UniProtKB/Swiss-Prot annotation:
PROSITE patterns: HSP70_1, HSP70_2, HSP70_3. The keyword Nucleotide-binding applies. NCBIfam families: PRK00290.1, PRK05183.1, prok_dnaK. It comes from Methylobacterium nodulans (strain LMG 21967 / CNCM I-2342 / ORS 2060). This is Chaperone protein DnaK. The gene is dnaK. Residues 621-630 have a biased composition (Acidic residues). Belongs to the heat shock protein 70 family. Keywords: ATP-binding, Chaperone, Nucleotide-binding, Phosphoprotein, Stress response. Acts as a chaperone.
Amino acid sequence: MGKVIGIDLGTTNSCVAVMEGTQPKVIENAEGARTTPSIVAFTDDGERLVGQPAKRQAVTNPSRTFFAIKRLIGRTYDDPMTQKDKGLVPYAITRAGNGDAWVAADGKQFSPSQISAFTLQKMKETAESYLGQPVTQAVITVPAYFNDAQRQATKDAGKIAGLEVLRIINEPTAAALAYGLDKRKSGVIAVYDLGGGTFDVSILEIGDGVFEVKSTNGDTFLGGEDFDNRIVEYLAAEFKREQGIDLTKDKLALQRLKEAAEKAKIELSSATQTEINLPYITADASGPKHLALKLSRAKFESLVDDLIQRTIEPCRKALKDAGVSANEIDEVVLVGGMTRMPKIQDVVKTFFGKEPHKGVNPDEVVAIGAAVQAGVLQGDVKDVLLLDVTPLSLGIETLGGVFTRLIDRNTTIPTKKSQVFSTAEDNQNAVTIRVFQGEREMAADNKLLGQFDLVGIPPAPRGVPQIEVTFDIDANGIVNVTAKDKATGKEHQIRIQASGGLSETEIQRMVQEAEANAAEDKKRRELVEVKNQGESLIHATEKSVKEYGDKVSEADKAGITTAIDALRQALAGEDVETIKARTTDLMQASMKLGEAMYAASQGAGPEAGADQAQAKKDDVIDADFQEVDDKDQKKRA
């Protein structure tokens, strides 16, 4: 069995770790960084870029650079959050045939799972490069407040990337695993996780290697991206006030504002003021325009105060559900890059009444926890038991559109619960089971996970048939539902796949595309390498012809020129084999030149060689040594 890796698939950045013996290790990527931007881009010629290379070109290619894609995963196009996101990103968000939110570039649609898979592939390659062996299994983290559709879509992303996802683990729980691995003390901890796109808070009880989640709460559309957007809105408003030009209508300018906003936000965690300079941000009839302004930490805090306050209500709910008060929390662990912001640390300190623990790296702790869980599943990590919970209540729609709960939120998973229902009308021979997830009293106000029909119910007065509905939630938080007619024993089981979601056929198609893309990337790399080799050979040969051309016959020189022209022509194309063949031809043609160069370096023959040797002999000078007393030398110095 190969190594199982732990991956934190983040909104802004992703990270991969692995267990080395009893210690988790974060793996650096090809660029030497410990985290990788969760950004995927497609260039003019169709090349796919992932991570830092994609981020670097975002300003000049905004409509084909996909970032914060995690905010769309498992969401429908009509979801209010999707519609909100449409106004915030420069790329196209489109409606897929199944009603899901997908993204598009150059007329081609991609599911968020597919884009996420490209990032996961990069993580997989990073691990394989470090371990020196293929990696096929992983533990992937998700926000604790992700619903079933979002969890399933994340699992699909892993499958598309060529990974068997052994476990989906909640981010705050992973952070708690990393935090508590080496600590033998017991107690109640709160994990406050504010990342790039999502917010979670979990209350856990730790003791004797048991990590028991008591409650979880959060907001899957609150994170660093929103903080960046507040700065972008402020910069655009200030520029419009001064120059009368609306930068939000210009995709390129908007991308530059976004990059500047992220940089300013990071700087304001350590500095009290930062300067934003964006020369040539736009132009009008009067000429180019530049943006230059100072942003203080106090101003930034006022711009985002409501966002920070939005994290407090989930904290209150989590404490209430766990049945503990803030002063009963022994330690508050901060996770996610946004928790570096001093104001957030102050708010957390005020709410919980204690200084938050800053001993973990907020960008890496989740991946480390995922690696620990991978180690548990692999048998490398002993005496660790993880008990997680389902974040949202699960139930079905019953008469009058009421949401009838079968499993309450914060129930420890895996879990199974059954309840018997009946028909609403006389002689009803089929029932539609509509499965929802959420906390509202009416089914329509909650998230529809999926629906199915149980048919062939024998005719009977209403209320007589007994239909047993069973909910089964696995350790990944993914739901299976069974409906059984107790009279006939007829059963219908579905693994919840939202009315949207990817079908098995679509997943297989995307897996094949990912494999084809990997092959295409390899071909592209090979093309670049043979082109570089060909161009280097032309340069070296032309230089040699200038220096030693008079040492070879005109016929040989003509042959070299013809071979250079043929290779140049091949380099203008994309055929690797042709370039290789023409490169070999040029190497053959220039062999005579090589012989001439070798002869020239040997001199004009044996006599010249002998003369040179004699000259060298005559040049030898006898050394005249003089002994210097060490003490004497020191005195002179």
